[in-house]
Structure formats: C-alpha cells, structure tokens
C-alpha cells in the first residue's frame, strides 16, 4: 500500500514542533483544500477500505518516518520479564478480590483459566505477526497489512483507549495499596468533590504523581527501563511466592464449600473482566522493532511470560479464596486484608510492597508499549506525525510517551476503577478478536495469488465462524437456562472451521515461526473473545459505542484525509523513483551500445 508522504519533511524537522508536524498533508494547507477533501470523502473512504499495506512498507517505509531508528537492545530475557512485569500485578492486585466477591466466588480461579486460555490463543496470533512484521505498531500494523487502513484505524483508537484506561486503572490501584502500606484508607489520600458525579468525584493526585515518574523512566531508554523492570519483577515474584506459601499455611478448605455461588454465568462474567489481567503481552509485541533476534526472542519471551503469568494467577486466586470466605474479601486490597483477617497483620506490608512493585512495572511496560503504538499510528499519519518522532539520543519516542501518559494521568485523577475495568475489557477483547481474524486472512488470502473461488469460500467460512460465535454469545446473554441454541450455533462454528481446514488451501506459510493448528486456534480465539464480550454489561458497550463514534467523527474529519494524502504522495514518489531508475537503465544501455 502506498502510505508514505511527508517522509523528507519529517527527517528534516527531526524533533521540531511546527505546524507541519501536526497537519502537513495537502488537504489541510488551506480551507479550500479542506472543503474539497470533505466533498471527496466517499471516494476516499472506499479507497482506504480497499487498500492494504505490505510487510515491507511497515518494516522499511514506516520506520523511516520517525527520523531516527529505535535501538535494538532487547533479548528474550528482556521480553520475558517485560511480559511478566506488564501483566502480573494488574489482575491479581487489582481485580481478583473484586471479581471473587461480586461475580464468581472461589470459582474465580476458573475465570482466570478461561481468560488465560483465550489470552494464550491471542499470544500465538500476536507472536506470528511480531516475528513476521517486527515493528513498533503491534496489532495496528498487523491489521493495516491484512484488513486495511480503516479497520486498523478503529483498532488504533481502541488500542489507545486500552492503554490509557488500563494505565489509569492501575495508577488508581497503586494509591489503594500505598494507603494500606501506611495504615490508611485509600480515601484518605483522595480529594472528594461532591459536585462531580459519584463515579468521578474521588480525585487521586497520587496516581498523577506515579504517572509522572513512570514517564521519566520510559523516555530515558528501553534497555535501562528493561533493567529496572526485571529487577523489580524478580522482587515481585519473590513476594508472590511468599503469598502463595504463607497463604496456604492459613488455608481453610471450608471456604471452598460453596465453590460457584454465582453459577457458570458468574465464572464467565468474571473471565471477561479478568481478561484485563492479560493485556500486557501485546505491549511486548510492540518492542519487536527493538529486539536483536525477533525470530527467536519474541516467541520465547511472549509465550514464556504468558505461561508463568497464568500459573501465578491461578495459584494466587486459589490462595486468596482459601484464606477468607469470598463474602469477606476486600475489593480494594484483597490480599493485605486477608492476611490481617488470619492474624498476620505484618504480612500485609509485604503484600502491599509487592503489589506496588508489580503495579509499577505494569505502568512502566504499558507506558513503553502505548508510546510505540502511538508512534506507528502517527507514522501512518492517522495521528499528527509529531508523535512519530524518535529522539536521536535516547532512541525512544519521547513525544508519544509524554502525551499518552498525560492522558493516563488525567483519567486516573477522576475515574473510579470499576468503570475503567469494564470499558477496558470490551476494547481489549475486540482487538484480540480482530487480530485472530487477521491471522486467518494472512494464511488463507494473498492478493494476486489466491483464486476467486478460494477467496469466496474462505470469506463464507470466516463469516460463518464470526456469525456462529456472535450468536452463541448473544444466546448466552439473553437466555439464562436454555441450551437448544448452543446445539445450533456451536456445530456451525465447528463445521465452518473444519470446512476452512479441508476445503480452502493455505495461501501463505510463516517464514520463521507460525501459529500451530491453523485454522483451529485462531478460530477458537475468535469464538472465545466474542463469547467473553457477551458476558460484559450493557453500559460498557454503550461507552464503547460512544468512543467508537468519536473515533469515526475524527476519522471522517481528519484521519481519512491525512492517510489518503500520505498514500498518494508516497505513490507519486515511488513512481518518480521508478521512472528515474528506468531512465538510468536506458541511458546505461545506450552508452553500452555506443
């Protein structure tokens, strides 16, 4: 796909901050140009829907727009600890108590298993893409290549939402554990403004301060951040081992007598929210551009960190519910309060310290990941190209880091955790589902190579997989006791996947590392992610729809025209270069003949 334009200007400006760093495209150079662009919106929109990027464009062309290269300093060791640091802390120390008490009881461990399996399926999809397309854009870049510009933009907006909201949730929980460490209630450190709505009236200045410190750590250099992360993560793992061992010594099996007080529905409802605990792994995929050997290091780092994470989550969930009846679990600081309840008041300080360490690394890795997402999104001119600039000295995207963490701090200052967690899960599941779809498209459809017959068969089977998965989720949400619907929807999903496996030939094989059991694992990832979406409350979907509506307005007014102009400018540059090269060849041949 032609998707360049403005490259020379960006290189010339380095890290400047001028008008052209924000709206350099032709459509925004005058009001007349802009009005003309708006009139052409339908045709431009169709162009962006039908246009797909190329692996080579993402790897070479897009990277050049940052002016400077990111430094390749990371190994599998760094990626593994980045994955562990990104994930462990957010789920265990933020949401486990909340979900065990309100939705699933002791069966919260099953919720972690369900969300963990779904996350592992997504990890496989991300890993293949990250190895094949090792750039900072993560899922945004993958969707640009396989599903086109428009779907990539919708994903990009939700990626931004995912990271900003996720960081805000963890920053607010950081305050809760800090208060516990000092023998205070979280509200002692928050400012209550009754004039604001109930969900936005508990202002959190400590969360803002934490975001500011993380910002400084994230911009100084990725290798330095990695050292800080794995030292902090190792300390955190020691605390986790203490919690598991010490917790089991205070276990009471009577607390497991009512294992599923909220039924199977509660297990899946919690699983949808607890998916928040696994989102850190996609931040690791954005570091592919800074990895020394992506083909080896990314699979080890991503898959390895997810295995460690899932085991830790399940063991700690079991420990918590054995220590204390689920009705008495504290939703804000569950482990600290649980140790106090069994007479180990001193242990809560170890737990609080470990939680603070864990949430600090979650924030740090999230800050690194979200800045790299934003950088690649800006390289595509879907956001101002000023955000794509990479600092020559540090090799990090300072502009994107500061902007994203400022937004995180603002939301953390106002918004309660429950709203953040529900909204985040919708966005995350939506993106992971589309990455699985993109993986199937990558394997089964190659432009110019796949026959029309095979393409049409693939689209039919993919549509049936999506439709049957959606129908299963809707039936689950609407029918609490019935089972007849599943006898229709599940076989359709199964037979559609079988048909894709045996009736549609794969058009492309991965060069280095690939997802096993295609199409089964991507198809299962699609089904599970959509099913978990069906377990989320209606209000969260309303907020998600509002945010998507805002994204569409921005896209129609700005993003569409910026990317269209950039694509056309780059196409002209390529054509001019090709003509020049052809002219040079002709001249050389003439000289030889002479």
UniProtKB/Swiss-Prot annotation:
Topological domain (Extracellular) residues are 100-104, 171-201, 249-266, 319-348, 415-418, 479-483, 533-543
Q: Which GO terms describe its cellular component?
A: membrane; plasma membrane
Q: List the Pfam families.
A: AA_permease_2, AA_permease_C
Q: Which family does it belong to?
A: Belongs to the amino acid-polyamine-organocation (APC) superfamily. Cationic amino acid transporter (CAT) (TC 2.A.3.3) family.
Where in or outside the cell it occurs: the entry states:
Membrane
What is the phylogenetic placement of the source species in the record? Answer: Eukaryota, Viridiplantae, Streptophyta, Embryophyta, Tracheophyta
Annotated TM spans? 79-99, 105-125, 150-170, 202-222, 228-248, 267-287, 298-318, 349-369, 394-414, 419-439, 458-478, 484-504, 512-532, 544-564
Primary location class = membrane
Source domain of life: Eukaryota
Q: Name the tissues where it is expressed.
A: Expressed in roots, stems, flowers, petioles, seeds, siliques, and leaves. Mostly present in major veins.
Q: List-wise, which residues carry N-acetylalanine?
A: 2
User: From which residue to which does any coiled coil extend?
Assistant: none
**Protein name (Swiss-Prot/TrEMBL):** Cationic amino acid transporter 1
- Activity control summary: Inhibited by the protonophore 2,4-dinitrophenol.
Keyword Transmembrane tagged: yes
Q: Which UniProt keywords apply?
A: Acetylation, Amino-acid transport, Glycoprotein, Membrane, Transmembrane, Transmembrane helix, Transport
Known glycosylation sites: 102, 255
Species for this entry: Arabidopsis thaliana
Membrane topology term reads: Multi-pass membrane protein
Q: According to the UniProt record heading this chain, what is the dependence of activity on pH? A: Optimal transport of histidine at pH 4.5-5.
What are the protein's GO molecular function terms? transmembrane transporter activity
Q: Which GO terms describe its biological process?
A: amino acid transport
Is Membrane included in the keywords of this UniProt record? yes
Q: What does this protein do?
A: High-affinity permease involved in the transport of the cationic amino acids (e.g. arginine, lysine, histidine, citrulline, valine, and glutamate). Transport mostly basic amino acids, and, to a lower extent neutral and acidic amino acids. May function as a proton symporter.
| Sequence ranges on the Cytoplasmic membrane side | 2-78, 126-149, 223-227, 288-297, 370-393, 440-457, 505-511, 565-594
């Amino acid at each position: 796909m032609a998707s360049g334009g403005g490259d020379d200007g960006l290189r010339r400006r380095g890290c400047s901050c001028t008008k052209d760093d924000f709206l350099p495209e032709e459509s925004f150079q005058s009001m007349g140009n802009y009005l003309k662009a708006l009139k052409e919106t339908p045709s431009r929109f169709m162009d962006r829907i039908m246009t797909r990027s190329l692996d080579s464009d993402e790897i070479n062309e897009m990277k050049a727009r940052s002016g400077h290269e990111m430094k390749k300093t990371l190994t599998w060791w760094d990626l593994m600890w980045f994955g562990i640091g990104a994930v462990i802390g957010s789920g265990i120390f933020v949401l486990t108590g909340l979900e065990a008490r309100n939705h699933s009881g002791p069966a919260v461990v099953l919720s972690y298993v369900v969300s963990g399996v779904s996350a592992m399926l997504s990890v496989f999809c991300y890993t293949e893409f990250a190895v094949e397309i090792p750039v900072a854009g993560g899922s945004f870049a993958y969707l640009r290549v396989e599903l086109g510009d428009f779907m990539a933009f919708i994903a990009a907006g939700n990626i931004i939402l995912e990271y900003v909201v996720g960081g805000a949730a963890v920053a607010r929980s950081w305050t809760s554990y800090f208060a516990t460490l000092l023998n205070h209630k979280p509200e002692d450190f928050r400012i209550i403004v009754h004039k604001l709505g109930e969900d936005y009236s508990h202002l959190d200045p400590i969360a803002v301060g934490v975001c500011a410190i993380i910002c400084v750590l994230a911009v100084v250099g990725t290798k330095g951040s990695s050292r800080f992360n794995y030292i902090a993560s190792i300390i955190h793992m020691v605390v986790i081992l203490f919690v598991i061992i010490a917790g089991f010594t205070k276990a009471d099996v009577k607390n497991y007598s009512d294992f599923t007080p909220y039924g199977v529905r509660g297990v899946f409802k919690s699983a949808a929210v607890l998916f928040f605990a696994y989102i850190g792994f996609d931040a690791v995929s954005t570091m592919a551009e800074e990895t020394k050997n992506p083909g080896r290091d990314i699979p080890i780092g991503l898959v390895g960190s997810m295995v460690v994470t899932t085991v830790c989550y399940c063991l700690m969930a079991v420990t918590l519910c054995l220590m204390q009846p689920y009705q008495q679990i504290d939703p804000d600081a569950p482990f600290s309060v649980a140790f106090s309840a069994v007479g180990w008041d001193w242990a809560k300080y170890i737990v609080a310290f470990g939680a603070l360490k864990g949430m600090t690394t979650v924030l740090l890795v999230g800050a690194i990941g979200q800045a790299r997402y934003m950088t690649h999104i800006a390289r595509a001119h879907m956001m101002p190209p000023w955000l794509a600039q990479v600092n020559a000295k540090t090799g990090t995207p300072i502009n994107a880091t500061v902007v994203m963490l400022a937004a995180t701090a603002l939301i953390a200052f106002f918004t309660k955790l429950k709203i953040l967690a529900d909204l985040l899960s919708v966005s995350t599941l939506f993106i992971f589902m589309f990455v699985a779809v993109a993986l199937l498209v990558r394997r089964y459809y190659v432009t110019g190579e796949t026959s029309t017959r095979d393409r049409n068969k693939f689209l039919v089977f993919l549509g049936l997989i999506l439709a049957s998965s959606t129908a299963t989720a809707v039936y689950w949400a609407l029918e609490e006791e019935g089972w007849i619907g599943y006898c229709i929807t599940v076989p359709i999903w199964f037979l559609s996947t079988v048909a894709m496996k045996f009736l549609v030939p794969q058009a492309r094989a991965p060069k280095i590392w690939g997802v096993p059991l295609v199409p089964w694992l991507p198809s299962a990832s699609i089904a599970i992610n959509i099913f978990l979406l069906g377990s989320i409350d209606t209000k969260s979907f309303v907020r998600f729809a509002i945010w998507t509506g805002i994204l569409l307005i921005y896209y129609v007014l700005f993003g569409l025209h910026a990317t269209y102009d950039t694509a056309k400018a780059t196409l002209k540059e390529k054509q001019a270069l090709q003509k020049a090269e052809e002219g040079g060849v002709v001249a050389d041949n003439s000289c030889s003949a002479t």
